[in-house]
Amino acid sequence: MKHRTFFSLCAKFGCLLALGACSPKIVDAGAATVPHTLSTLKTADNRPASVYLKKDKPTLIKFWASWCPLCLSELGQTEKWAQDAKFSSANLITVASPGFLHEKKDGDFQKWYAGLNYPKLPVVTDNGGTIAQSLNISVYPSWALIGKDSDVQRIVKGSINEAQALALIRDPNADLGSLKHSFYKPDTQKKDSKIMNTRTIYLAGGCFWGLEAYFQRIDGVVDAVSGYANGNTKNPSYEDVSYRHTGHAETVKVTYDADKLSLDDILQYFFRVVDPTSLNKQGNDTGTQYRSGVYYTDPAEKAVIAAALKREQQKYQLPLVVENEPLKNFYDAEEYHQDYLIKNPNGYCHIDIRKADEPLPGKTKTAPQGKGFDAATYKKPSDAELKRTLTEEQYQVTQNSATEYAFSHEYDHLFKPGIYVDVVSGEPLFSSADKYDSGCGWPSFTRPIDAKSVTEHDDFSYNMRRTEVRSHAADSHLGHVFPDGPRDKGGLRYCINGASLKFIPLEQMDAAGYGALKGKVK
């Protein structure tokens, strides 16, 4: 999935080692003791966990961590679920694991969580992560469903929405994929639309988490998907590939804009982050599934790949062991593997993702565009008027600095040409030309239309230090800005609540009084 974004810890530190392996082991025998272990623990406010565990109900457990931004954004949502009558047929609790998988130590976690305000959220602390380890939890957030008879019925790795959670409680085997959020997609059937000239190549270079994240950062790459290629069985699982010798290689399907990048460009980026002389091993990962290879679907590409390999060989004394073969088969990896380092910025990564930001020899970056408008024109209505005209969510977000749920707003995946204005005052804030899919769950921009249209403030909520972004004219809370955006566009990610914005389509800008800004829209 295409999310050209941050991986802030990965980018800053060259990728941190989480567990020293690309993916988890199979759930171990200790999983059978989960219900008993859970009942002996206490919550963050020192209440017995057994208070939340009714014996005649299944138990839905959410595993999360203080360092996981997606987890933090979902705390309020999970608290509401825990109080919602729709969830009354199950015990709904959350588990934090101090001292495990980079979580804070127990005392530090307790002190940190005491500074938050989720009084009705059941947070059980499992010091050392005994339960998480027995269930092989290595992705945050993750969910576990424990049946009435104390059996582990299902593990779900990644975020789930309300419909998925309820379906899981009703049926442990429910098809959760059919209940994903659906988002607006641009109309590609318009006569004036341009069809992108895309090509696809399949690259194997060790653990696919890092390789997928690396290519997602490269300008001109449209999509990067983790999967299993050139094996001997159909529809393999991770466990099949890792433990049952299926012959597949962990591979990333890279789709790129051929008008921006050539296959040779892609291969140059590829060779930057793999050791082409290492047989069945990249980073800390060893096995035939971690072999290196370039798999093509167009026979004409074999010669291009061969030429690139010949050029690369000149850099090494040892022979290259990179496969140059036609693609025999490719199967998407499980959902929790997709965009893994977006979901888990602390996750294992065997390559230096920062190399994606280094232009290839002879390549240049786009120069920034000009800016400018008078923000003093826009006024903030009275509070009474705002309560009358705004929705409850819009009011709470803009006036009380609330945060909408991740992936909940239609603007997150809206990419029509136009501008985004302050829903309170109408002040122009952001352009579709600067919008990108960061994968964080909120509309993301590389810059405002004009730097003077927003103000920045220190924000110490969640016991963290972040930079809040507010509108200039109406002082509306918009979101936050982070230094993990696309490097070639300034390196900033303005992470903005959709509820703070109003979208003005390009074709309506003249009528709405924003015609002078049409040049800011692509």
Swiss-Prot record:
Pfam families in UniProt: PMSR (PF01625), Redoxin (PF08534), SelR (PF01641)
Annotated spans, Peptide methionine sulfoxide reductase A: 199-354
PROSITE patterns, A to Z: MSRB, THIOREDOXIN_2
Thioredoxin domain sequence ranges: 17-174
EC id: 1.8.4.11, 1.8.4.12
Catalytic activity entry: L-methionyl-[protein] + [thioredoxin]-disulfide + H2O = L-methionyl-(S)-S-oxide-[protein] + [thioredoxin]-dithiol; [thioredoxin]-disulfide + L-methionine + H2O = L-methionine (S)-S-oxide + [thioredoxin]-dithiol; L-methionyl-[protein] + [thioredoxin]-disulfide + H2O = L-methionyl-(R)-S-oxide-[protein] + [thioredoxin]-dithiol
Record keywords: Disulfide bond, Electron transport, Multifunctional enzyme, Oxidoreductase, Redox-active center, Transport
MF (Gene Ontology): L-methionine-(S)-S-oxide reductase activity; peptide-methionine (R)-S-oxide reductase activity; peptide-methionine (S)-S-oxide reductase activity
GO CC annotation terms, alphabetical: cytoplasm
Ranges for domain MsrB: 383-506
Cysteines joined through disulfide linkages: C68-C71, C440-C495
GO biological process per UniProt: cellular response to oxidative stress; protein modification process
Active site: C207, C495 (nucleophile)
Coiled-coil ranges from the UniProt annotation: none
NCBIfam families (alphabetical): msrA, peptide-methionine (R)-S-oxide reductase MsrB, PRK14018.1
Chain's role: Has an important function as a repair enzyme for proteins that have been inactivated by oxidation. Catalyzes the reversible oxidation-reduction of methionine sulfoxide in proteins to methionine.
Alphabetical list of HAMAP family matching this protein: MsrA (MF_01401), MsrB (MF_01400)
Domain comment as written in the entry: Possesses 2 methionine sulfoxide reductase domains (A/MsrA and B/MsrB) and 1 N-terminal thioredoxin domain. The domain B exhibits a thioredoxin dependent methionine sulfoxide reductase activity; the Cys-495 is probably involved in the reduction of MetSO and in formation of the sulfenic acid derivative. The regeneration of Cys-495 is probably done via formation of a disulfide bond with Cys-440 followed by its reduction by thioredoxin.
Record protein name field: Peptide methionine sulfoxide reductase MsrA/MsrB
Source organism of the structure: Neisseria meningitidis serogroup B (strain ATCC BAA-335 / MC58)
Lineage summary: Bacteria, Pseudomonadati, Pseudomonadota, Betaproteobacteria, Neisseriales
